[in-house]
Amino acid sequence: MRVWIDADACPKAAKDLIVKFALKRKLEVVMVAGQPQIKPAFACVRLIVVPSGMDAADDYLVENAVPGELVICSDVPLADRLIKKGVAALDPRGREFDERNMGERLAVRNLFTELREQGQVGGGQAPYGEREKQAFANALDRILTRLAKG
């Protein structure tokens, strides 16, 4: 089984957790990025740097991930494309994307995009701390177990 990572936006702590799970469960990890990254020095990890361009990494993930695999991403429209293809998607904060919550997640994302463009809200997400790492580890374990069972 493969775990794909949208590597440009994934926190290093989450990438490190994914590699630990991969070593323990004998999984392949594929990091896809639009910019060069530091690849963890383990044989189970591959780094693919796609040509720069709008959504190039997203397009690569959608084209190459298959049902039964997991993609780690924060990008809600990317997750929507993956879910429609039957690929599991999880954000680095431990929130799983699925058919039931995708409409709401897209609506919230679009609302905040509009508010940011109007200058009504600023900044991004809260810092990635221990609580987020634990939530991610728990969700990652749960989803990998489910996918392994088929």
Swiss-Prot record:
<dbReference type="Pfam" id="PF02639">
    <property type="entry name" value="DUF188"/>
</dbReference>
<comment type="similarity">
    <text>Belongs to the UPF0178 family.</text>
</comment>
<dbReference type="InterPro" id="IPR003791">
    <property type="entry name" value="UPF0178"/>
</dbReference>
<protein>
    <recommendedName>
        <fullName>UPF0178 protein PSEEN5341</fullName>
    </recommendedName>
</protein>
